Amino acid sequence: MRFHTLLFLSFLLLVSCALICTAQHPGLEKSGMFHENVGKGQHIEEKRSCIERMQTCEVEAGLPCCSGAPCICPYIGDCICIQ
């Protein structure tokens, strides 16, 4: 009986870790998205083309991203191009 309880608790721990990781990084499971290629030597703030998180970049608004292709800003990291 103790073995089954320990096995069940281990399973719950693995599932909760997976759920927490997915909740903290919601963009990881989305397919068809690629990171923007940014040249070397740019400052870290210049790499991020979007102003607010999850904002869509627009070339007309002066926010260049992905050579004019649509993109989004994740919570953490560089803009992501939607290919």
Swiss-Prot record:
Keywords, ordered alphabetically: Disulfide bond, Ion channel impairing toxin, Knottin, Secreted, Signal, Toxin
Subcellular location: Secreted
Residues of the propeptide: 24-48
Tissue/organ expression: Expressed by the venom gland.
Keyword Electron transport tagged: no
GO cellular component: extracellular region
GO MF term set: ion channel regulator activity; toxin activity
Residues in the signal sequence: 1-23
Domain of life where this protein originates: Eukaryota
Claim: Transcription is one of the keywords in the record: no
Cysteine-cysteine disulfides: C50-C66, C57-C71, C65-C81
Homology family: Belongs to the neurotoxin 07 (Beta/delta-agtx) family. 03 (aga-4) subfamily. JZTX sub-subfamily.
Domain notes: The presence of a 'disulfide through disulfide knot' structurally defines this protein as a knottin.
Function summary: Inhibits TTX-sensitive sodium currents in rat dorsal root ganglion (DRG) neurons.
Name recorded for this polypeptide: U25-theraphotoxin-Cg1a
Provenance organism: Chilobrachys guangxiensis (Chinese earth tiger tarantula)
